[in-house]
């Protein structure tokens, strides 16, 4: 997924730059949400496999073979020290390891494509900074967001969809 966006973004940035606009090529590192936990757990499964254990990739994990060398690297780095630890003990370290390993792959892909980023921005750096809360406060004060429930997805049956209240942006009123 990141490659397609990088190619499109780089082409667009090049066109804008050629047209005289000042352009900053920024890569947004999606390292702050639950998907990083899923990635770390998936690497942990591959790590267990590296020790000959049989594992099952349940729904919500990533079974991709691209995780095998990452797990082997983890095995070389920490040995068997995670095998008998609880998830609470290994997950925080493995989250960081997973993000670093994926960013190494992404940077390698970008280099192969000849795409140079000016900056890399970590989503995680926003947490605890107060910036998210401040932005939501400004949007709320200006009447641009509200609490509501989305309609069910159209065009396909979803057995797992449940209505839930969430913060929504008033996009229909603002273009």
Language model segments and positions:
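NTP-dependent nucleotidyl-transfer catalytic core
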Residues: 1-175
